Amino acid sequence: MRPILMKGHERPLTFLRYNREGDLLFSCAKDHTPTLWFADNGERLGTYRGHNGAVWCCDVSRDSSRLITGSADQTAKLWDVKSGKELFTFKFNAPTRSVDFAVGDRLAVITTDHFVDRTAAIHVKRIAEDPEEQDAESVLVLHCPDGKKRINRAVWGPLNQTIVSGGEDKVIRIWDAETGKLLKQSDEEVGHKKDITSLCKAADDSHFLTGSLDKTAKLWDMRTLTLLKTYTTVVPVNAVSLSPLLNHVVLGGGQDASAVTTTDHRAGKFEAKFYDKILQEEIGGVKGHFGPINALAFNPDGKSFSSGGEDGYVRLHHFDSDYFNIKI
């Protein structure tokens, strides 16, 4: 399995997202310019220029016409995917951490960090069909009990009825997307012991996977918030992804830059590790990055995956045929 090495960013990667068809890959990094690639051969198609801060997250609409990005420059932006034109800017008074389109693309959930006197918040915005009619009003604003803790990820639940969030306070919360009422939150006993860094939904929205600095990833039932599985690894987990094809999960991570030694690379600490989703056992690893892995994404067809690292590279891996026959 020879990776395709994609160099388009000057700074560490933060997020990767495929479109629904799996032919396009969007990457975000700390260098202000989200980038679009062909997901098949890694060819760079273009960049989206307009942010002046690290871009933490992005999402693409179902028909691949719109892109939404969230940045440390205190804005979230809507873009025309094809032309690269900036369609609208949502301005906040705090860095924007996470963005996610609802099913149907008429709503988006955006999280903002704690900043000066502003508490961390989850905002629901209406997305107009015609960019000319777009406004910045929030339909709903949610706050976690500890407003100083960052909300690293918020995504839509099944049928846009709920919003699932997780972050620095280690708690996963499920909110009613209409009323803003807190419906469920993860139990301290079974939940993560350190910051939740990443969250990835299954293709059918029935369950989701969270990654944490406590060196585990956990699989949860989307409706009941029951803990289903726990995957334990040797490094803090920065990124997680679920295979849409096989019962596999992939985890990526590594020490924070300040704690890294050159031996970590040789010790296999910067591998993307694959686990059997059901048996919770490690089935393999993919090396390559010279530093922690910050972003992971499976192609929607399940036949390839990409990883983004602190080293500024995106590595695109098309699986060999023997991957599909792994037996434990």
UniProtKB/Swiss-Prot annotation:
Cell location: Cytoplasm
Any one of the GO CC terms: eukaryotic 48S preinitiation complex
Stored InterPro entries: eIF3i, G-protein_beta_WD-40_rep, WD40/YVTN_repeat-like_dom_sf, WD40_repeat_CS, WD40_repeat_dom_sf, WD40_rpt
Keywords: Cytoplasm, Initiation factor, Protein biosynthesis, Repeat, WD repeat
Molecular function per GO: translation initiation factor activity
GO biological process terms, semicolon-separated: formation of cytoplasmic translation initiation complex
WD repeat residue numbers: 8-49, 50-89, 146-185, 191-230, 288-327
SUPFAM superfamilies: WD40 repeat-like
Signal peptide: none
Source organism superkingdom: Eukaryota
PANTHER family: EUKARYOTIC TRANSLATION INITIATION FACTOR 3 SUBUNIT I
Task performed by this protein: Component of the eukaryotic translation initiation factor 3 (eIF-3) complex, which is involved in protein synthesis of a specialized repertoire of mRNAs and, together with other initiation factors, stimulates binding of mRNA and methionyl-tRNAi to the 40S ribosome. The eIF-3 complex specifically targets and initiates translation of a subset of mRNAs involved in cell proliferation.
Subunit-structure text: Component of the eukaryotic translation initiation factor 3 (eIF-3) complex.
The family this protein is said to belong to: Belongs to the eIF-3 subunit I family.
Stated name of the protein: Eukaryotic translation initiation factor 3 subunit I
Species, as recorded: Arabidopsis thaliana (Mouse-ear cress)
Gene it is expressed from: TIF3I1
